[in-house]
Regions:
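Catalytic core of pol beta-like nucleotidyltransferases
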Residues: 1-22, 30-36, 47-96
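Short hydrophobic/aromatic beta-strand micro-patches
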Residues: 43-45
């Protein structure tokens, strides 16, 4: 099973590749209770140089690198008034 540091390094590499500003890792890997079956949950803060269509390529690349299923979203896709938004900001681990 990949360590949290290995996952964070893979995300950093992909943030640079796709010109995104930062990301939040959330879910079981952020909480430290991931199992071998856990997926990766990532919110991307794209910024002005990030093409929103690249979120799919970033997720595919992360899945290929880690061998994990990946749920990735660009922050603009998340309703800021939702419980989901609050949850990712409360438990998320920032990666830049």
């Amino acid at each position: 099973m990949l360590t949290k540091d290995e996952i964070e390094n893979a995300i950093r590499f992909l943030l640079r590749k796709y010109h995104a500003e930062s990301a939040l890792l959330f879910g079981s890997y952020a909480r430290g209770d991931a199992t071998p079956e856990s997926d990766l949950d990532v919110i991307v803060f794209g910024g002005k140089h990030f093409k929103k269509t690249n979120i799919f390529a970033l997720a595919e690349d992360l899945q290929e690198i880690t061998g994990k299923n990946v749920d990735a979203f660009e922050i603009s896709e998340v309703d800021p008034n939702s419980a989901f938004y609050d949850s990712i900001h409360r438990e998320g681990v920032k990666i830049a």
